[in-house]
Amino acid sequence: MASTYNSFNLHTTAEKFYIEACDDGVGDVLAIDRVSTEKTLTVRKDVPPSAVTRPICGIMGTIRLVAGVYLIVITKKKKVGDLLGHAVWKASDFDIISYKKTVLHLTDNQMQDNKVFLSMLNSVLNTDGFYFATDYDLTHTLQRLSNTSPEFQEMTLLERADQRFVWNGHLLREFMAQPELHRFVFPVIHGFIAMRSCCINGKIFDWNLISRRSCFRAGVRYYVRGIDSEGHAANFVETEQIIQYNGAKASFIQTRGSIPFYWSQRPNLKYKPKPQISKSINHLDGFQRHFDSQIIIYGKQVILNLVNQKGSEKPLEQAFAKMVGSLGNGMIKYIAFDFHKECSRMRWHRLQILVDTVAELQDEFGYFLVDSDGSVQMQQDGTFRSNCMDCLDRTNVVQSLLARRSLQSQLERMAVLHVGQRIEEQADFEKIYKNAWADNANACAKQYAGTGALKTDFTRTGKRTQWGLLMDGWNSMIRYYKNNFSDGFRQDSIDLFLGNYAVEEADMNTPLHEPKDWKFLTLPIIMVVAFSMCIICLLMAGDTWTETLAYVLFWGSASVVTGGVILFNGRDFVDAPRLVQKEKMD
């Protein structure tokens, strides 16, 4: 595999960017013309002495906004650890640099739009969880990498990457077209990585957890649900647990993703909007495309549907079960487990019912195992696909339990655990394991829902606590606010970053200028005034109590009625995406 360069210097002049590879013995320089945007290879001596120089950690890519093209670079990185001897990095800071030296050619409206688009890019880049490696392919699992051809092994990181998980793929499209530039760029994944050195029975091993978020049908909690016409599921995450000990390595893969048919749950100011299943689209086509691709990539599928089997979630569970039955594919098994019902009143021990139910299937699927001499001893031929409504809180709890069961078998096979020993009894390792899975839950939740995960007290400690319930309540309130009043901007940011919306240079008519309905400002003002008058009437009593009561009833009724009208027209008041029209299923 042709690895990419590790470190760079960015030399900036008025005419060009010069990106110098600083690896030992390398003199390659990438020159980018700031006017024509042409990219060519040159050498260090061609860099003008007058250039302003600074170190950078890598190139994220380029993107066109209203003011012209921008170069996005990684300016800070933090080492996460080593995977099979290869350094894995977390990108922690970025810079967005304009090719143009001035924005004086823009109108005031264009400059304002450009600022909004820049803030959208920063919104995505500031979402924690971008990772990369310069000499290892983070987009593939160990098992996929072991089943590749010699031709695949010779490809550059950019050419061979699994495009589902390359979050800077759109930004690198121009680099992709020039193979001679591939050593200057690398794929960046989004999700979570934890790498820990652990010890059990005096035996030191590496335990790694990698979650890769798909960039297909990416978005935020209430605006992106279900699947698209290609069968890509919302909030799809591939999670791989890797063990390395004494030259041997093992891997266990699980997936999560939104319920894979056409449904929506648009925010409307209600705490929990009612899900809507499309009545006009043929669900089975997209449903089959989704599982056909999953079977090709992961083998047999066991669906663990954790949604409620009553209330607003019940129709989704029933439709999911019906579609699996209609598909009639022996490679797919469906298991419904009403998480909230089974674990109600703090009965979290009942999760063991689900683990025991799937134990035989998990043993049948196995895991990927390579011994110390490099020979493959076992392959994982099936995957658990877990989901709840958001594929976050309930899903993460179940995935951590299944991963622990696989880990028990792996460590016994590697002779790290003695016969009869349980992972749960290894207090030091259990703390590492639970905290990493809780951190994984928080990362996935922040990226999709805007807050940390719920129920992480159980993941961290193995039991629910009063403090955990309070934190869940706080996070739920923050989610409510963000989902209703800021997620439209977040969705637009993701669509811009991933290329779902393309900005035309000097564009005069962007969707950012869509006018708000008159109700957006008028009704909230009326409600605030009416409520304020109600309070004033209570504090400043009239001549008689009947007069005071009349005023209070009038202004109180006005505020209640106005609030009711606002709730009835809830979708007019939420922050909705403007760049790409999201599907409406109702």
From Swiss-Prot:
Q: How does it sit in the membrane?
A: Multi-pass membrane protein
Its UniProt entry gives the catalysed reaction(s) as: a 1,2-diacyl-sn-glycero-3-phospho-(1D-myo-inositol-3-phosphate) + H2O = a 1,2-diacyl-sn-glycero-3-phospho-(1D-myo-inositol) + phosphate; a 1,2-diacyl-sn-glycero-3-phospho-(1D-myo-inositol 4-phosphate) + H2O = a 1,2-diacyl-sn-glycero-3-phospho-(1D-myo-inositol) + phosphate
Entry superkingdom? Eukaryota
Location of region: Essential for phosphatidylinositol-4-phosphate phosphatase activity: 451-586
Just give the chief location class: endoplasmic reticulum
Stretch forming the signal peptide: none
The GO biological-process annotations, alphabetized, read as: phosphatidylinositol dephosphorylation
- What keywords are assigned to this protein? Endoplasmic reticulum, Golgi apparatus, Hydrolase, Membrane, Transmembrane, Transmembrane helix
Segments crossing the lipid bilayer? 520-540, 548-568
Q: Which residues form the SAC domain?
A: 121-450
State the EC number(s): 3.1.3.64
Q: Where in the cell is it found?
A: Endoplasmic reticulum membrane; Golgi apparatus membrane
Q: One GO CC annotation, please?
A: Golgi membrane
Chain ranges sitting on the Cytoplasmic side read 1-519, 569-586
One Pfam match, by short name? Syja_N
Molecular function (GO) terms for this protein are: phosphatase activity; phosphatidylinositol-3-phosphate phosphatase activity; phosphatidylinositol-4-phosphate phosphatase activity
Q: According to the UniProt topology, which residue ranges lie Lumenal?
A: 541-547
- Tell me the function of this protein: Phosphoinositide phosphatase which catalyzes the hydrolysis of phosphatidylinositol 4-phosphate (PtdIns(4)P), phosphatidylinositol 3-phosphate (PtdIns(3)P) and has low activity towards phosphatidylinositol-3,5-bisphosphate (PtdIns(3,5)P2).
Entry-linked PANTHER family: PHOSPHATIDYLINOSITIDE PHOSPHATASE SAC1 (PTHR45662), PHOSPHATIDYLINOSITOL-3-PHOSPHATASE SAC1-B (PTHR45662:SF19)
Q: What is this protein called?
A: Phosphatidylinositol-3-phosphatase SAC1-B
**What is the native source organism of this protein?**
Danio rerio
